[in-house]
């Protein structure tokens, strides 16, 4: 058997190729995982709950499961194997922290066959998904499992301080031993829900050296692209409202500093993009083939498992996409440079890589041939800074609020002035109609009023309907905070136009010039309308 098959690739020469890992068929690995976890979690429920102690992080429990069964284990049709559980009490605490009950954990992993996923990475690991879409089970190398064991105390402390994180959430570490072969697996949170179709998937490191999806990967139905592909497809980045952007970058910065403190590097941001504008078309054309069965609820049950929960985001985009809506599956609302509405699903993956001697040597020889800053393998501090810079400047961007130009502001002010002027005219007209009624009730005749108001011009057929200039000016001050002036050419000495302290100019005019309102009077306008005052606004 070829070495590629041993690393997890398909065995050639078979119609329905079954993957193998370390010369063990994936079906045998899946069966052993379900049997082993079913036994160890069930056995753990009998132990009383207590606080996690330091020695609990280094406990390893082991059970032998023969194919014929035993007093403690059921019979099965797989080869005999031994199943080890690392730090069972510590991982039980982690599961409880995220609201995972033992029964739910067992039901998710053991009730239905595990779904095997393709692996776009170079590690050769196998990936399995639970039928309810909650958990990912991944095979890991010996060094990765060993590193996770050493990481557990610090990981425990970090989760206590901040359970909302984009870092992987580990729920269990196990080892299957059969025929002298050790297969180590880790149970983690699922970042990309199957119920939501991912139109684009990216694995981003912030590096450019060989960071383009291979031709083989591109031929897959759902390929995973890389950094250079993202820069080509989304050259202007992804846009968020201010609150969501700040929450996302704050979470990324905190998580990167945690990884840096553990001397972890070579991690990636797994980014799934669902285009809302395409979702209706997809539903009309074809049903979602890989959707979970009806037993699965619309949202994930595990606490802090969605992307929006992980960044502590507000759950609302600039144009009102609500992340709490079950249809969004907890995705983060965003927009593309084309204006497309998006839902983003993301998480930091592949954190079980410490900056050891082999990584230092790998970077050293690559830096001799290529630009050292573009190589993905780097010292942890530089890697974190480059990762954050790439996310902040090339991937995620903030929607800038549009500022109105001065001309638009002036137009808006003029429109408001016109509207307010109409209100003033209406109020003035109504006020004088009321006053006319009061005058009529007091017995004042139309002729005497005309005589007082118009002096020598006797117009008994007209009723004064225009307010005094000064009264109109006092009302006009509510239009704008601009200065209000009375035109100097106004004939103040013509007192014959006023009567009973409520003189009536024949007409009055507002003139607007650069934020200043001028009032002018035209006393020679003789023809006055009966039902409204002659008050014009010139702009």
From Swiss-Prot:
Its EC number is 2.7.1.68. The modification Phosphoserine is found at residues 445, 447-448. Residues 1-21 are annotated as: Disordered. One of its GO terms (cellular component) is cytosol. Keywords: ATP-binding, Cell membrane, Cytoplasm, Kinase, Lipid metabolism, Membrane, Nucleotide-binding, Phosphoprotein, Transferase. The keyword DNA damage does not apply. It is found in: Cytoplasm, Cytosol; Cell membrane; Endomembrane system. One of its GO terms (biological process) is phosphatidylinositol phosphate biosynthetic process. One of its GO terms (molecular function) is ATP binding. PANTHER family: PHOSPHATIDYLINOSITOL 4-PHOSPHATE 5-KINASE TYPE-1 BETA, PHOSPHATIDYLINOSITOL-4-PHOSPHATE 5-KINASE. This is Phosphatidylinositol 4-phosphate 5-kinase type-1 beta. The gene is Pip5k1b.
